[in-house]
């Protein structure tokens, strides 16, 4: 980690912090996620190892790319490329919602990235605006895989996890331990309306209140989930809310088009078995009308290539700067040597000092013409110029090799932004920027940004119930995170 210069704190949370750093060799700006002393905290170690393992396996244009992993003094360090903009930033800048074309491009990439994870039997489990990054070119990146995991084998159950309540599917809220990919699809449905309208769809302030919001919009839970709710000791003495009159999506958001409402409804089906797969969502009319999917797929590849070129140009610029600094230092060194040499030959002392004060070229001509032997000596004493080549190979400081030679994309795990050090970029055409009024997003999210390590506990307008659920699990602990050895990088082409 000595090769990185710390430029300041980006954010911090319960499990660690993220720092903005510069690679001293290449000048490249990166984000380094530093976990707490994971050897002393089993939960921190579990989260760190899970994120490292999954990010090493997954390589996709819409997923954050892990550049390097180090372990120093019982702490894990994850090195990512630096990006300081998320969809949450867009929603705070444009509280009335984003433009149709922007939402269309964002959702296409979000579903594309989640679908890639699902094709490798991995569920993210914490999809939300602050975990979706956006590069300067508009490339979306899913990040923060600390709660992601592989799908359970038949008969195996999942352990409970702490994720953002507003985007939890009903099966998670009632304590079902046999959930699957459908929980990510539910979160997509929540994002659909939030990006268009600028407000969260189900802003519950407790698990039972969250269920109330869901049932008010979508109706009663399926029988299996009702049974799980009644058997869950956390809800002992509590009944599911009785819904006298529903407020469906089309009534709540009359300005949204039918195709948008239909996309959201499909993702938010109360029965997880009836929610579509990501591949089906990409063929929805919302993406297929006017040839958007085919046209944007080509545009996306150009955006990815542009980001890669920007990284390459940045490296070359830094290298040229460092070589210029070396050249300047050599000139100063030569001047010093020439001045020292005049002490041995007083007859030419005044002449040499006069030439040194002149231009660099004049000084070199004088040396070549009048002091050939001295110039030869200086030539031998020069430091050779070594070209600095941006390194693409990854080295684990804990003797774990990582080989990543592909062009990395630009991403950073999100944490609370320190706006004094990091100013988010604003994409044009995003929407109409207004001065935020006092409300749930201003009260809770203007603390500079969200902290993904510390899950939000914001209040809902209804606030009818106030009971949190914790799933009771009797199954064995996860085996995929307990290993102390860092897994080898596996590229997915």
Swiss-Prot record:
Domain Protein kinase: 4-287
Residues given in the record as ATP binding sites: 10-18, 33
Gene Ontology molecular function: ATP binding; cyclin-dependent protein serine/threonine kinase activity; protein kinase activity; protein serine kinase activity; protein serine/threonine kinase activity
Protein origin, superkingdom: Eukaryota
CDD domains per record: STKc_CDKL2_3
Keywords: ATP-binding, Cytoplasm, Kinase, Nucleotide-binding, Nucleus, Serine/threonine-protein kinase, Transferase
GO biological process: sex differentiation; signal transduction
Pfam families cross-referenced by the UniProt entry: Pkinase
Matches recorded under InterPro entries: CDK, Kinase-like_dom_sf, Prot_kinase_dom, Protein_kinase_ATP_BS, Ser/Thr_kinase_AS
Annotated catalytic residues: 126 (proton acceptor)
Class in the EC hierarchy, top level: transferase
Gene3D superfamilies: Phosphorylase Kinase, domain 1, Transferase(Phosphotransferase) domain 1
GO cellular component labels: centrosome; cytoplasm; nucleoplasm; nucleus
Enzyme Commission number(s): 2.7.11.22
Organ and tissue specificity: Expressed in testis and kidney, and at lower level in brain and lung.
Main localization (coarse): cytoplasm
The keyword ATP-binding belongs to this UniProt entry's keyword annotation: yes
Protein family per UniProt: Belongs to the protein kinase superfamily. CMGC Ser/Thr protein kinase family. CDC2/CDKX subfamily.
Protein name listed in UniProt: Cyclin-dependent kinase-like 2
GN (gene name): CDKL2
Domain topic, free-text comment: The [NKR]KIAxRE motif seems to be a cyclin-binding region.
Enzymatic reactions: L-seryl-[protein] + ATP = O-phospho-L-seryl-[protein] + ADP + H(+); L-threonyl-[protein] + ATP = O-phospho-L-threonyl-[protein] + ADP + H(+)
Consequence recorded when altering residue 98 to I: In an ovarian papillary serous adenocarcinoma sample; somatic mutation
Motif ([NKR]KIAxRE): 45-51
Subcellular location: Cytoplasm; Nucleus
Keyword Cytoplasm assigned: yes
């Amino acid at each position: 980690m000595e090769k990185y210069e710390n430029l300041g704190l980006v954010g911090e949370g319960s499990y660690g912090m993220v720092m903005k750093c510069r690679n001293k060799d290449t000048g490249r700006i990166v984000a380094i996620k530093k976990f707490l002393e994971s050897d002393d905290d089993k939960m921190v170690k579990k989260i760190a190892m899970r994120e490292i393992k999954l990010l090493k396996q997954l390589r996709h244009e819409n997923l954050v790319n892990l550049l390097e992993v180090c372990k120093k003094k019982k702490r894990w360090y994850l090195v990512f490329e630096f990006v300081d903009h998320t969809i949450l930033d867009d929603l705070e800048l444009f509280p009335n919602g984003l433009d149709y074309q922007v939402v269309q491009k964002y959702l296409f990439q979000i579903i594309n990235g989640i679908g890639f994870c699902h094709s490798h039997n991995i569920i993210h489990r914490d999809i939300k605006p602050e975990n979706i990054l956006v590069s300067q070119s508009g490339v979306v990146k899913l990040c923060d895989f600390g709660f992601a995991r592989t799908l359970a084998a038949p008969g195996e159950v999942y352990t409970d996890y702490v994720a953002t309540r507003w985007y939890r599917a009903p099966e998670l809220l009632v304590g079902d331990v046999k959930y699957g990919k459908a929980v990510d699809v539910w979160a997509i449905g929540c994002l659909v309306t939030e990006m268009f309208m600028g407000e969260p769809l189900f802003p519950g302030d407790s698990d039972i209140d969250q269920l109330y919001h869901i049932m008010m919009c979508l109706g009663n839970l399926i029988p299996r989930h009702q049974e799980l709710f009644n058997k869950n000791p956390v809800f002992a003495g509590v009944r599911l809310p009785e819904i006298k009159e529903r407020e469906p999506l089309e009534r709540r958001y009359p300005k949204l088009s039918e195709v948008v409402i239909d996309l959201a409804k499909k993702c938010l089906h109360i029965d997880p078995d009836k929610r579509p797969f990501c591949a089906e969502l990409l063929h929805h009319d919302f993406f297929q009308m006017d040839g958007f999917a085919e046209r944007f797929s080509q545009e996306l590849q150009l955006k990815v290539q542009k980001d890669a070129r920007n990284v390459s140009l940045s490296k070359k610029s830094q290298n040229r700067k460092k070589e210029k600094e070396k050249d300047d230092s050599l000139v100063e060194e030569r001047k010093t040597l020439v001045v020292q040499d005049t002490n041995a030959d007083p007859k030419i002392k005044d002449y040499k000092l006069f030439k040194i004060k002149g231009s660099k070229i004049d000084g070199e001509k004088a040396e070549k013409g009048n002091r050939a032997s001295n110039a030869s000596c200086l030539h031998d004493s020069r430091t050779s110029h070594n070209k600095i080549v941006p390194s693409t190979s990854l080295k684990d400081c804990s003797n774990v090799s990582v080989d990543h030679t592909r062009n990395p994309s630009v991403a950073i795990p999100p944490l609370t932004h320190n706006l004094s050090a990091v100013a988010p970029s604003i994409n044009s055409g995003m929407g109409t920027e207004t001065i935020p009024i006092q409300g749930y997003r201003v009260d809770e999210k203007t603390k500079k940004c969200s902290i993904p390590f510390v899950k939000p506990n914001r209040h809902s307008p209804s606030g009818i119930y106030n009971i949190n659920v914790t799933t009771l699990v009797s199954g064995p602990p996860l085996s995929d995170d307990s290993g102390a050895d860092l897994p080898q990088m596996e590229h997915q082409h």
